Structures are given as structure tokens and as C-alpha cells.
């Protein structure tokens, strides 16, 4: 029997897909990358904001068409949308045969067997599993869906921050760290598979260890991983400004294998908005944290995200945010319009902002950030940057990859010419000749 997967959403959800892939293969099923060939398709959904829900629903409908018009026998929905809406998915989408909440991903083989065996017997009974997400076994063997030289390492699950706009705590549960020894062992296993870039993720990686060890232990974890492996690039995503410890800064500064790159979602800078969002800390704390990072790690690259159009955001709040962004000159920044989500405190807030105003503010702030990116990239012309090669484009006759300053999927690319074909996962030095928007173009200098 052939099983197909559709994996949506963030890297953290992608890791859940990888765990399910392993369990499905271990049970003797065949995985097919072609949906049209599949007997069962598993749609692992995102669903924490409106656009993600729409994407998930569109994919479910696409798969439902295959069930109606091809030989697809069953559809299983997992992930955040499944956790959030549960059995109502079975009611809204009669084509769906099974729904598994985020606490039930280890039941995926049972779900496949249930829906396929029952269909053979002529039963139309649905399968639904919604185990306690706060007690589910964390981690598990995986089948990597990333390029072989790069992998994500999820060090925790859930979130305790309770931001007013966010449904993640209700979807993913309370924050739970994975034991340090398990993570070190997983990093060693990933290294044995050829991984050269390890991207550390969780809902809030800087909270790591507080529940298990009574302290923030991210710096200790990173140190142990670099002692136990020789993985050359370790990258940090999803950090919170109020938990950037001196120990973490020192580890990033002094450990050459921890990239001088940090993803630090700030969401806003106006104290009025930070308080309304139930963010931890205020403008003064954020500015001090940024100043300390720049001071202690002068070449650090900071990525952040902002939400515009949150309920009650005034023109003064937005202008303060724009001026802050122009002053800070972040190397990377994403801007998102506020998404009004049920079962979050902000859903019932007064002074909801018009959708067009949200879009206009997003466009304005992104224009500011584009100008900053162009300015910072122009400063790189003539410099040499370390790049991990991702692939070769035979049409353009150039290789492409990412510098240490660019995270997978979300940041820019480096395009470079080479007299010889460079294997994906190889590290090279590239001299930058020109820039276009977020991307760099140059020539290979040496292969590392």
C-alpha cells in the first residue's frame, strides 16, 4: 500500500511529519511522493492563523478531489488544524476518514490500518484520536525531509508565553523540554547521516530547560552538542528577547560553530502594543537586549518579525515601530498583518483594525525593511562570505546556496559561478560582486 504525505506549516510541524514517515515505513508501507499514486494521503496541517487554515483547507479539498476521481482510498488529517477543530473536520469534510490531534501522531499506523481495513469490510466509520498533547512522547526516530546536509532539531514542544494573539498554547500545549541527553544523542545521529547545518527550533528555544532543570539551559545544551559532534553550523530560531541570558550570549560569541545569527521575534516596540499583546518585557528591555547582542557579538545577524494592525494600534504606535525598524537596521525582518483568531484573548478586544489598514501598514513597513536590506547587502559587495552550496541551476548555469547570515526557506540566497560542479552540502567561499533585492551574486574563491 502506498502512502502519500502533504506537510504544511513551520519546521516544527515538518519534524512531526518526519516522525510519522518513520513510523509508516517501519510498519512496512511504501511512501510515494506522487499524490496521484497514493492509496492513503496524510495531510499534516498548520492552522494557527487564518492564512494557514485556508492553505490547509485548500489542500484537504485538493486531496478530496483525488479520492473522488482517482484510486485514493482514504484521507487522514493531522497537525494543528486537526488539534484545533477535532471531530468537526470529519463533519465539515465527509471525504476525510481520520483525524489525529498533535498528541496522537504516534497513532498514525493505527489510523491507517483502521481506515483501510474498515473500508475493505464496507464500514464507513471514521477514526478519531485526540490524546493529551501535554503527555505525548516527545521526539522519535525520523525520516529527514530536508536536504541531507541540513536538519532541524526540535528541543521542546508547546509554549507558556500566552501572547494575546496566539492560539499555539491551546493547540500545542504547555512548554515541555526534551532531556538534554536525548537531544545530544539525536544531534550525533543526524551528524552520522551527513548533516552539516543543525537548525535548533521550538516555540521558544530560549525557555529550554526551565521545566526540567529549573533554569534556562540553552547555552549548556549548545555547548554539549558542539562537544559531542563536529557539526560546523548550528543556527538558532525562535528566541525570545526576555530570555537572552549572558551565558547564551557568551556561548554564541565564543563558540565558532554557533552561527552569529539569531531569530528574535519582537512583534512590536510600542509599550502600549507590547502590553496589549501580553508580551514579556517592554521597549527598554528590548533595546537593551539588542544593544548587548550587538556589543558582545559585533558581527551578529538578527532576524525578527512584527505584527501590524493589532487591536488598538494607533498611528503613533505604528510610526514608533517604523522609526524603530529604521534605526535598528535588522538584517532580516518579516511583517505580518494581525490575524484575528478565535479562542485567543485578542479575538474579543475592542478597536479591531480595518483589513485594508493592516495591509497598508504591512506594505509600508516592508518597504522600509527592503531599503535596509538593500543598504546592508550593498555593503557586502567586494567581501567574501562563507556559503553552503544547495544546488546547481543548469538553466542559469550558476550554483546557489546560503551564507551563514541566511536561514533555510526564510532568508536570501547566494548565487555564484564556479569552474567546477560543487556538491550540495559543500562549504565554499564566495566573493560578492553584486546584489539584487535580498540575494547576493558572486564567484567562488575557494572550496573550504
Residue ranges and their predicted role:
Residues 47-48, 172, 212-215, 275-281, ...:
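Short glycine-enriched, charge-decorated loop/helix-capping segments at active-site entrances
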Residues 1-208, 247, 262, 284-291, ...:
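Proteins enriched for Cys/Gly/acidic motifs involved in redox and nucleic-acid/cofactor modification
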Residues 3, 40-41, 151, 198, ...:
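Conserved beta-strand core positions
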Residues 183, 200, 236, 264, ...:
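Conserved, mostly hydrophobic/aromatic
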Residues 202, 238, 266-268, 304-308, ...:
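Active-site proximal loops enriched in glycine and acidic residues that flank catalytic Cys/His/Asp
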Residues 313, 327-330:
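Contiguous mid-protein beta-loop-alpha structural module that forms a pocket-lining wall or clamp
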Residues 74-79, 84, 89, 192-316:
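Conserved SAM/AdoMet-binding glycine-rich loop
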Residues 348-448:
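Terminal RNA-binding accessory module
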Amino acid at each position: 500500500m502506498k502512502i502519500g504525505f502533504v506537510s504544511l506549516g513551520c519546521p516544527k510541524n515538518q519534524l512531526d511529519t518526519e516522525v510519522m514517515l518513520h513510523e509508516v515505513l517501519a510498519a512496512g508501507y511504501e511512501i510515494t511522493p506522487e499524490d496521484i499514486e497514493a492509496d492513503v494521503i496524510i495531510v499534516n496541517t498548520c492552522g494557527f492563523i487564518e492564512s494557514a487554515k485556508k492553505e490547509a483547507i485548500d489542500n484537504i479539498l485538493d486531496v478530496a478531489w483525488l479520492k473522488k476521481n482517482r484510486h485514493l482510498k482514504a484521507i487522514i488529517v493531522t497537525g494543528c488544524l486537526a488539534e484545533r477543530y477535532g471531530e468537526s473536520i470529519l463533519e465539515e469534510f465527509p471525504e476525510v476518514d481520520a483525524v489525529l490531534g498533535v498528541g496522537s501522531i504516534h497513532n498514525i499506523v493505527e489510523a491507517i490500518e483502521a481506515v483501510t481495513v474498515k473500508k475493505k469490510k464496507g464500514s464507513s466509520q471514521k477514526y478519531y484520536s485526540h490524546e493529551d498533547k501535554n503527555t505525548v512522547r516527545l521526539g522519535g526516530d525520523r525520516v529527514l525531509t530536508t536536504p541531507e546536509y541540513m536538519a532541524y532539531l526540535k528541543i521542546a514542544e508547546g509554549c507558556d508565553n500566552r501572547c494575546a494573539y496566539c492560539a499555539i498554547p491551546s493547540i500545542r500545549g504547555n512548554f515541555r523540554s526534551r532531556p538534554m541527553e536525548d537531544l545530544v544523542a539525536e544531534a550525533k545521529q543526524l551528524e552520522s547521516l551527513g548533516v552539516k547545518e543543525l537548525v535548533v527550533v521550538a516555540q521558544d528555544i530560549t525557555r529550554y530547560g526551565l521545566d526540567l532543570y529549573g533554569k534556562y539551559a540553552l547555552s549548556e545544551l549548545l555547548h554539549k552538542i558542539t562537544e559531542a559532534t563536529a557539526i560546523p553550523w548550528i543556527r538558532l530560531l525562535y528566541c525570545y528577547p526576555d530570555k537572552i541570558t549572558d551565558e547564551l550570549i557568551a556561548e554564541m560569541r565564543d563558540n565558532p560553530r554557533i552561527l552569529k545569527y539569531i531569530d528574535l521575534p519582537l512583534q512590536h516596540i510600542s509599550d502600549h502594543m507590547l502590553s496589549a499583546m501580553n508580551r514579556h518585557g517592554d521597549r527598554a528591555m528590548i533595546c537593551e537586549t539588542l544593544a548587548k547582542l550587538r556589543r558582545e557579538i559585533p558581527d551578529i545577524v538578527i532576524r525578527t518579525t512584527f505584527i501590524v494592525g493589532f487591536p488598538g494600534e494607533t498611528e503613533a504606535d505604528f510610526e514608533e515601530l517604523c522609526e524603530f525598524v529604521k534605526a535598528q537596521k535588522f538584517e532580516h525582518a518579516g511583517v505580518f498583518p494581525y490575524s484575528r483568531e478565535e479562542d485567543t484573548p485578542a479575538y474579543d478586544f475592542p478597536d479591531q483594525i480595518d483589513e485594508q489598514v493592516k495591509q497598508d501598514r504591512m506594505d509600508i513597513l516592508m518597504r522600509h525593511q527592503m531599503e535596509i536590506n538593500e543598504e546592508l547587502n550593498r555593503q557586502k559587495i567586494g567581501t567574501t562570505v562563507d556559503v553552503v552550496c544547495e544546488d546547481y541551476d543548469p538553466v542559469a548555469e550558476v550554483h546557489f546556496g546560503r551564507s551563514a547570515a541566511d536561514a533555510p526557506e526564510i532568508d536570501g540566497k547566494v548565487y555564484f559561478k564556479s569552474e567546477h560542479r560543487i556538491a550540495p552540502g559543500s562549504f565554499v567561499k564566495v566573493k560578492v560582486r553584486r546584489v539584487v533585492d535580498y540575494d547576493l551574486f558572486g564567484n567562488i574563491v575557494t572550496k573550504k
